Structures are given as structure tokens and as C-alpha cells.
């Protein structure tokens, strides 16, 4: 989603493909009717659990509204501020309205705020506690700026398509990993009194054809994500279940179609899965311009349209009058919105909506300081921990008091201006050639208070050390001083909203690496990557001694990297995706789906692979990756021992969970602990470090391994710590499409614990 200004132009530029119509083309969407089951009526919010007080207040508030005031709450309006969207005020009842703004890694299009690390970077940290702290400090900036709702975080896309343009906004390709990190992120943000609108619900896995478009007089519908019930529950709905359980006050529905019904008027996904099965108490907001039906969308469970609506307004009251919509539906829409306002305690002491969001940052405006010195430590640490060291030949890193270093590559320098933080590109280049990459493009961009670029931070380090630095960041085949101790090469891999990537490598950057490596025996490569980046063209070069996937660290990029290069911090990041040896190893999930054959006007993307994406697919097909999911090196070594598996006897292991009233997140018994696992980890290396212990389970009739636990622990040199994992009923279950329940199967389950999805020194089993 995006600011109102420029919306039409942006949508017109979004990546679109179409097939010319033929006699065989399907020309009416009536062909697809019924593929997404109808679920009506839209359930009313119950105000259960932690929502009780907010709902009581909201119902009293809504009871005093006129029909027109209720309608006004359901659609955005223009306002003299820079918020991405606004809900109008109701002055007579002291409701000041709402400001909602991008994005999940810091505010966009404003000043006096920080540019935080992106979702993929947080995913690479594997640090739940840090994710919550990042959310809390980031949320406090939104609060000071008068932003009621943060448009994020992201768990859709999950990362099904390797070239997906927005994969970098999410945390991980694994639903369990993504779910735990989004849970902690939401808890942190909302603890600051700012609501989250978690996105994009659901199965929004490519940018190509995400919106309906007309080109040369040909109308092409948005792509349809066609998903079976089992895959939906076990993969794509999984992290959203954690979102609801965390209490997210809003969820943003997506652009594309789901089983040939648009995401923002799909009664199965909104009424059925979200509001009934998961017990969601907040409100559903459209992505910007994602409403395609009037009363059909409200009856399907949509509660708020952004940035405005031409299909609702007085049409809602007319529909109530003519009986095509129940008055209770409008009341529920308004109640959910106002209850969320109360739930965040924004009725008392919250700044005026949008007060710190100027419509034009270059015009005179009041300075509202969002950032705080209290955030500096968390800001830097969140940047540090998302770096992943994947090669370290002969312990090249950390650098050992070098007398001279040389820096090469376009990604080393800072930008010439901050305009990049505000712009929308009308295309998606393979790289950002003009400066270091701290964030991807589109509505997920953010506004840095400063940028610590790698070259700047390295020069500062050299000043402090009294050493020397040479640099040539523009040459493709630079000269290298033979006396240099290390050659640091900086490249990047760009991605943006609106477009899927054209590939996972770029020849120019690879050529730069090999050119330097041919002249320098100690070449260290840093990649700022907005998604998967292949390295097969040079990873085995004998002079490439170390490689870091630096992801998208935010404004502290250079400072964080220097902490790692010089050994003041020990790398602890792990990959939240699989890096293949060859692009073809991703198979049908490499490229986005394009319109073809009889579906030229109604693109169809069949998720026929089921749950087998990324490492699950590599395991199933026996493909050896370059670097597996969960992989990352350290400056120390960790030894695993003492696997202990103990079943919890006081919780039911019945086939289906005991019946219970639905709470936020679904049946509360899904979180009953069934199994406890513990392992001992010893730091047998030379320095203290953080290790991410990962637990995988082989569930009968499922993938070889699925992540079902991870803990990040600090271990001093020579010390041993015991790491414990608690596995709930959902963690060990599969979705029964007949019973429509989570099924705990009888049989033998495999348990694996170790350093990555393929480095698992401990293995055991248990039987249910």
C-alpha cells in the first residue's frame, strides 16, 4: 500500500503480463464461481478475552452514532497531512479520527524518525526478544508522530516465489519462524500504544498481475492464488494465526484473488477463516485500491476501505434500507474499528492524528521528534544480528589489526540525497547502483535520520586504528594495491513493491567480485540483499575468503558491519531462506506465474506444490543447496549433546483438540504443551557467542522436517547451557480437511536439533 498521492500512476506502472485473447480464452469470471466457498453472514465481534473492556466502550460509542457517522468510519478520506490514510473525526463525540501509515520497518515520508532493519533482517536474527524490543521502540516513534495504526508487519508474502518482489518485507519462508517473530513484533509495537495492520492477507505471493489492469484495450484480472484447504492452514494461514493471537487490531487484505475471489471480498478467508475459525476481534482493512465490490465486500467481512471508497458511502445505508445488507453488519464494522482505538488506549493522551506527518516535508511544518536516544542500542543491535556469515576461509574474519584495507563496489557509499527514501520506481532494477542498500523499494521504504554507509564506518575505524584505507567504488575492474591486507567488495541485490525480480544474480556485480578476487588473495564480499541472492559464480573462488549476507540493516548499516568485521560483535545470524546452487533448483517456484492459455484474461497460479516450498522442497527432492535454511557461521564453535525428549502427561493427546470457546487465535487447546525437549550446547571455541538452536520435527505423512522450535542463547567460552523447547498441539498436528480440525496423528515422530535445517547432530523420536 502507499500514500494517496500518486496512487493512480503507481498502479499503472505495476508489473503486468497478459496473454492476447483467443477463441479459447475464458472471458467471464462466472466460469470460476464457487471455487471459493461462500461463508455468510459475517460474524460479529464478541469482545472476548482482552477485548472485553474495549468492546463495551465501543458499543456504547457506536450506539450514539448516526448512520452517516458509522459509514464515515469505514472509508478513508483526504486530510492535510502525510499519513498514508485517514479516517475522519467525529468532533461531537471527541473522536479525533485515525492516521494510518507505512510501514513495518519505520515511518516513511517524514522526518525525525529512524530507518529500522527490514523484516528479512529481523528474520535473519532469529531473535524473538530483539524482535519485540525493535517493535516497541519503533512503535514509540509512530506514537509520537500521531500515527494510530502502523501498516505492518508483513507475513504475506511468505516467500513462496524465489523472485518475489516483496519477500524482503516479511521475516521468513517458514511459517513457524515467521509466526513467532511477527507475534513478538506485534506485542512490541502495540505495547507502545500503536495498532498494527498486519499484511497481506492472504497468499499474496507475487507482484506480477497483483491488480486487475487494462492494456491495449484488454482487461486482465488479478492473478488467482489457488490453494487447497490443507496447504492454506499448514502454511499460509499459520503465521496469521499467530498474528491474531498476538492481538493485532487490524489485518490488511491483499490485492490478488484467492481461489478466484478477490482477497478483500472473499467470504471464506475473511468471514470463515479469520473471523470465525481464528476469532479475530479487530477490523479488516483493504490494501490501497483493493476494493472491487460494494455490498459484496462488506457482507464478505471487509470493515474499512483505504484510501477512500466510491462503492460504499451512502450505498451502505441504501443497502440497509433495501435489505441487501443488515444494519448489524454496519454496526459491527464501526464497533470493530472503535474497539481497536480503545484497545490501544488512544482515547486518552494520544497525540493529534498525523501531527508529526507533514504533507510535504520540504514545506514549513512543526518539528515532531519521533526518535529517541533510548532506541540507539536496540537500533544498532537489530542491525548487527541480521548479518549472516556464510563463508570464512581460514578464519579470515574477524580482521586482525590490518595495516591497510581496500574498499570496492557501488554498495559501499551513502546516497547523494535522501530522495531515494521517498521515491517510487517505475521499474525494478537488479541492483541499486548508486549507493548502499539499507531497505527495499515501495511502501515498505523508510526515512532514515542518517545513513552509516560501509565506507564511512570503515574510514572512521581506520582513523581510530591509525591504519590506512584505499577505495575505488566506481571501477568495474579496479587496481589493487598488493600491500593491502584485505579487499572488501560491496554489492547489493534490489527488490521493490510492484515488481517481481528479474533474476537472483546480476552479471555486473559478479564480474566485479571476480575481478577483485583475481588480484587480491583476501577478498571479503558483503551483499546487501533484498531477498535470495545466488553466489555460485564466485563462491568457490580461492581468493574469496569470506562472504556476508548483510540483508537490509537500516540506517546503522555501516556501524553494524564494522562491529562484526573487527570482532567486537560475533556473527549470530542465520538464513531465513535457502540459497540454491543454481536458479533452476527452485523449480516452478523460481518465477512468478504469468497469464497463459485459456486463462490469459484470468491468470491462475495453482499452489500445487502444497506445503513443499523452500527447504521442504529441497529436502523432498534431494537437492543439495549452496547454503541451507537456518545456516550461518560464527567466530566460535558450538557442540550439541544431551538430547532429552519428554512427553507432557497432563495434557490430552486425543486425535482432535478438546472443544472450547474460540479465543483470539482459535481453539486455545492448540497451544497445550504436548512435548518438552532439551539439549545441552557448549561453546568450545575461542570467543563468546550467540547460537540459534533449531528444532525440527518429522510429522507422519508430512515433510521430512519442519521447524518447530528455535532459541537464541548467549554462551561464554567453555560454558554449557541447557536449551529447552516446548511443543504445542498445533506444532505436532496436521490439518484434517474432512473434520476441519487439527489432527494429532498416532505414530512415530522424528525430532532433530542442531545448527541449521541440514546440520542436525542430535536426533530422537517419540510416539503418540
Swiss-Prot record:
Signal peptide: 1-19
Localisation per UniProt entry: Secreted
GO cellular component: extracellular region
InterPro entries: Cellulose_deg_GH3, Fn3-like, Glyco_hydro_3_C, Glyco_hydro_3_C_sf, Glyco_hydro_3_N, Glyco_hydro_3_N_sf, Glycoside_hydrolase_SF, Ig-like_fold
EC supergroup of this enzyme: hydrolase
GO biological process, one term: cellulose catabolic process
SMART domains in alphabetical order: Fn3_like
Catalyses which reaction(s): Hydrolysis of terminal, non-reducing beta-D-glucosyl residues with release of beta-D-glucose
Residues the record marks as carrying a glycan: 25, 72, 259, 315, 322, 394, 434, 472, 543, 651
A family per Pfam: Glyco_hydro_3
Function statement: Beta-glucosidases are one of a number of cellulolytic enzymes involved in the degradation of cellulosic biomass. Catalyzes the last step releasing glucose from the inhibitory cellobiose.
Identification of the protein by name: Probable beta-glucosidase M
Native source species: Aspergillus flavus (strain ATCC 200026 / FGSC A1120 / IAM 13836 / NRRL 3357 / JCM 12722 / SRRC 167)
Gene that encodes the chain: bglM
